[in-house]
Amino acid sequence: MRKFFVCVNLLLLLLTQTACTAESDCDIPRQEPLSASSSFHLLESVGAVWDSSPPTSGPHYPIAPAGGIYDFTLSSLEQVAFLESGGVIVQYHPNRIENNLGKLTLLANNNVIVSPNPTLDIPVIGTAWTWKISCKNFDTTALRGFITDYVGKAEANHRK
């Protein structure tokens, strides 16, 4: 009987170790500090600085771009304006997404921008107001979850 419990405990330990080390395509969404310059509405980016790249808050245009699919990289002023309006941006490195561009574009709508960004260190990044998720591979489930969790939530995080 004692051998049985030892075997069960070893099996549980092995399963726990396997589950804890399993690789996921996206990291856990992380909140970034609200930039002190987030209340600045600018008409040009001269002298503007953002705390991260791609940004999750900071100076921005007074009017946000429309949601949808873009074939160019949005400026940081455009990105932050869209995030402040409650939108989510999914950016991808055009040389690192393999055959997933069609799937990525399915995420786009009035509240979600999908845009290339060749300066990314990793294949896909999702941003929302003060939130970011990084993905080493395209992961529909993780990105849809991020969009669901953060689209429309900018105001709740704006004054923290």
What kind of feature is each model-predicted range?
Residues 21, 25-27, 134-136:
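Sequence contexts marking disulfide-bonded cysteines in secreted/extracellular proteins
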Residues 24-79:
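Surface-exposed, low-hydrophobicity interaction/linker segments
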Residues 35, 43, 83, 107, ...:
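A generic structural signal for short, non-catalytic loop/turn and secondary-structure boundary residues
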Residues 103, 108-160:
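Helix-rich interaction surfaces within compact, conserved domain-sized segments
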